[in-house]
Regions:
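The conserved beta1-alpha1 loop
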Residues: 64-68, 134, 159, 258
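Conserved HGGG/HGGXW glycine-rich cap/lid loop of the alpha/beta-hydrolase fold
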Residues: 49, 55-99
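Conserved hydrolase catalytic core segment
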Residues: 127-169
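Conserved serine/cysteine hydrolase catalytic core
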Residues: 210-286
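Active-site loop/oxyanion-hole signature of alpha/beta-hydrolase fold enzymes
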Residues: 91-130
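Hydrophobic alpha-helical topogenic segments used for membrane insertion/localization
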Residues: 2-30
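Short beta-to-alpha linker loops that shape the active-site pocket of alpha/beta-hydrolase fold enzymes
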Residues: 93-98, 161, 290-291
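Catalytic active-site module of serine/aspartate enzymes centered on a nucleophile-bearing elbow/loop
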Residues: 280-326
Length: 326
């Protein structure tokens, strides 16, 4: 995560600081917290919670996507278009984001992974799985891979969070309370019926036109901002889960880093390189013109993410052949 969003939001005076409560906003505002209709994918009941996902059945392994903070699965639109002729995929919305329902629960990384695993099972999407995570979603992808309960072909980390980033980076540490405050401000702003500031959602404009319009409508609702606050407050616990986890050294890992994130945090590149160093079979690409959000939402950057998926699949196949011949 970066400070770019927090800087651009004008977070000085929020409804939270004024002591607002949901009850004080009224019934009309509460209705804005309901799950939106018009979902582009399928809804699946998982333990009583409606979860939305984009699902495609194709050849090759199944690519499993984990979205960035507050983002819907449609943030991957360009990537999904790119890989649809080669792979199956599951791109799901976490509780409270996109078109998924929300029960207000804080979940551990393991519990989020269990929701994903149930979606894979219910929709009969076969292993092996290539896990791909953007931003905070990278923590969840790494956690899923480290659990060792599924056949994992590889891991793709796109400007991913690092489990030690708040320890090793003062910029990330300082940004965390600003990010929480910013997301809280956006929650109250949208709950009261006001649109988010343009700068907060401007990267959505890089998506295909129809998805950009749909994304803007989603982010005018308070639910994703509430979910973002919850996930920020759970971030430390997710990191702690990963500190005690181990990834196989033979697992192919592709890391795709946004070069512009380095501008605000001199430690970012070091942390990204550290993610790649977790495997003996790794690839690290830095996209100089990409920022933290458009690295998946802009078509040219998304093509590089698709290439990272291809690299991971090819090296997973090579690793499997090597293991069989040993």
């Amino acid at each position: 995560m970066t400070t770019r969003l927090a800087r651009g939001l004008g977070i000085g005076a929020s409804a939270i600081a004024a002591g607002a409560t949901v009850a004080a906003v009224g019934a009309t505002a509460l209705s804005r917290l309901s799950r939106p209709s018009g979902e582009p994918g399928v809804l699946t009941n998982v333990n009583g919670l409606p979860l939305h996902a984009l699902i495609h059945r194709g050849d090759g392994p199944t690519v499993v996507f984990e979205n960035g903070l507050a983002c819907a699965c449609t943030e991957w639109s360009w990537v999904l278009r790119d890989i649809a002729d080669r792979y199956s995929y599951l791109a799901a919305d976490r509780p409270g984001c996109g078109w998924s329902g929300d029960d207000g629960r804080r979940r551990s990384a393991r519990e989020i992974n269990e929701l994903t695993a149930q979606l894979l099972t219910q929709h009969d999407l076969p292993a092996p799985y290539v896990l791909i995570g953007h931003s905070i979603g990278g923590l969840l992808a790494m956690s899923f891979a480290a659990a060792g309960s599924h056949d994992i072909a590889g891991l793709v980390l796109v400007d991913s969070s690092h489990p030690d980033q708040l320890v090793r980076s003062s910029a990330q540490r300082d940004a965390m309370p600003m990010a929480e405050h910013a997301m809280g401000s956006l929650f109250w702003r949208t709950l009261s019926g006001r649109k988010p500031s343009r700068v907060a959602v401007s990267d959505l404009d890089d998506l295909p036109e129809h998805e950009a319009a749909r994304g803007h409508r989603l982010m005018e609702r308070p639910a994703p901002w509430r979910a973002a606050v919850r996930e920020i407050r759970t971030f430390d616990a997710w990191c702690e889960e990963l500190r005690t986890a181990t990834l196989p050294r033979s697992l192919p890992i592709a890391v795709v880093t946004a070069g512009k994130t380095d501008v605000g945090d001199s430690k970012h590149g070091e942390l990204q390189a550290d993610l790649a160093a977790a495997s003996d079979v790794s690839r690290h690409v830095v996209l100089a013109e990409a920022d933290h959000d458009n690295i998946v939402m802009r078509a040219d950057h998304a093509a590089e993410v698709g290439a990272a998926i291809d690299w991971t699949v090819s090296h997973s196949t090579a690793q499997a052949r090597k293991a069989r011949s040993a």
